[in-house]
Amino acid sequence: MHNPRKTHPLIKIVNHTFIDLPTPSNISSWWNFGSLLGMCLIIQILTGLFLAMHYTADTTTAFSSVAHICRDVNYGWLIRYLHANGASLFFICIFLHIGRGLYYGSYMNTETWNIGVLLLFTVMATAFVGYVLPWGQMSFWGATVITNLLSAIPYIGTTLVEWIWGGFSVDKATLTRFFAFHFILPFVVAALTIIHLLFLHETGSNNPSGLNSDSDKIPFHPYYSIKDLLGFFIATLVLMLLVLFTPDLLGDPDNYTPANPLSTPPHIKPEWYFLFAYAILRSIPNKLGGVLALVASIMILALIPMLHTSCQRGLTFRPLTQTLFWILVTNLLTLTWIGGQPVEQPFIIIGQLASILYFLLITTFIPLAGLLENNLLKW
């Protein structure tokens, strides 16, 4: 019998990806976040497209165009806040997705993992340039501070910064190009997502036991399509609660003041999802050192497959490493808190200790715990 679902060149790709995909029978709700990220990306691209129809990327009108969207465009306020809080939901899902990967040893699929690290960098770049667009105080000063970090690169730094700015300061040229980047990057993210899925489906999904599940696979549809639908409803509920009740909860009040190059806000800080990296950046009193630590704090994820020392894949049956994993999680929450605090004691020393512990846990303590657990298994 001719079944287009299995024979049509395009439909069969969808079939092998979302319908007849052999999936482990025991994956938990922690495996929902991949599809949730797909949902977030679609929400962001759609709301972003409608915002771009009304936004003007010019220093004189950018701020008022965002106000115009919220006041005069039909449901413009809803689209704007869905986009702003959708970014927060996106990062919550990303952090949980990466945390799941770390806990269950999903990073052993190295190609999938490395594309994921690349995706993280791209999404972070997208969020950064997007935050500049409303042209409020925090937009302007955030752009100034973060782009200025590139001047720490020896020899070419200053030239590079002025090239990115398109002048001698963050100005009209910077805003225009950031809008261009913010428009194109989500499509780069979408392309990388397809590659991420391609590599994942070469090996198949990992599962909570960390064992090979080839002997016990079930079709993705209807089992996990229905299960993912529950995740979609919960995530949408959380997003709508944020958007409709406390739309500015995660934003910065300073961004409701139009950008003013002559007035520096008392505390320059990025959106909450960058605070952990910002705290690591600030914990080093040297500019170049801080920039290197900032990049290393994300790039270290690419080293994790090489730092795996245990005989077992996940942490399900490894209580010692489990403890270290949760210490790492609390450490990252501490860094997030510190990133939003002013640069004064005791926050400086807490940030420095948390930064040191972050790198030590990943590069030293967790690999050593893996070796110790291997030896304990021989008793």
UniProtKB/Swiss-Prot annotation:
The keyword Electron transport applies. It is a multi-pass membrane protein. Heme 1 (or BL or b562) is low-potential and absorbs at about 562 nm, and heme 2 (or BH or b566) is high-potential and absorbs at about 566 nm. Belongs to the cytochrome b family. Binds 2 heme b groups non-covalently. It comes from the Eukaryota. Heme b b562 binds at residues 83, 182. SUPFAM superfamilies: a domain/subunit of cytochrome bc1 complex (Ubiquinol-cytochrome c reductase), Transmembrane di-heme cytochromes. The lineage of its organism: Eukaryota, Metazoa, Chordata, Craniata, Vertebrata. One of its GO terms (biological process) is mitochondrial electron transport, ubiquinol to cytochrome c. A ubiquinone binds at residue 201. Heme b b566 binds at residues 97, 196. This is Cytochrome b. PROSITE patterns: CYTB_CTER, CYTB_NTER.
